[in-house]
Amino acid sequence: TLFRSNVLPIEQDEKVTAMIHLREFPEDRYLVMVTRSGTVKRIQLSSIYTARKAGIRCITLDEGDELICVRETDGDQAILIVTHDGMAICFKETDVRCMGRDAAGVRGINLRPGDYVVGAARAKRDHQVLMITENGYGKRTDMDEYIRADGPQKRGGFGLKGYNVTEKTGPVVGVKVVSDEDDVLVINDAGVIIRMAAAGISTYGRTAQGVKIMNLEEGVKVISFARTDHEEEEEAAEGETPAGGPEQA
């Protein structure tokens, strides 16, 4: 409510999808937007600079569609899109031409009935693709399984199986690109958050089910997760306060 009233006046049925920290709006930087229905759009970062308090429209959405994620790019990256049913597609961002703010975008991934996009990320070689499911399962997969030797796929296809979704695992809730130096925060709909090292999550191929990474009580589901910088655990001697003072509540 505070964000809606003081920063960006949005409608009651709207919500903030992404926030990106920017200092400048150069001509050679871009925003890539991906929607729930698999549409992708690329615009120049400089085209959204505005002093208008009401903001500007950056994409025209079809009825029933919604913006899932926004990523800043340098114009020469690959984009990975992942769906609820575990399908994944990776293509060059240059496959998506730059458009004006009012354009609707183009097809990024074709979806089978009932499926929808849950996340997208900038693909990086020497990193891993992390997917986590509603029932607390997860896995890392080497990026090379998505970026072939001859380059990424072409946009607009059905993609490849990125997760073997079963009744046991539940559907995929999102995707992040991680390295061994990252940590991962996982949250469930009961409000419980756990933190773990990305390196501690096992690596499997695209068609594997992964392993249990969060124990859940009956009826509780994982709803989201985030990548964050790795935090070394420091063991303090008994009775001593760790360096830097006590952790704030």
Predicted region positions:
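Short, structured "edge-of-domain" segments at secondary-structure transitions
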Residues: 1-249
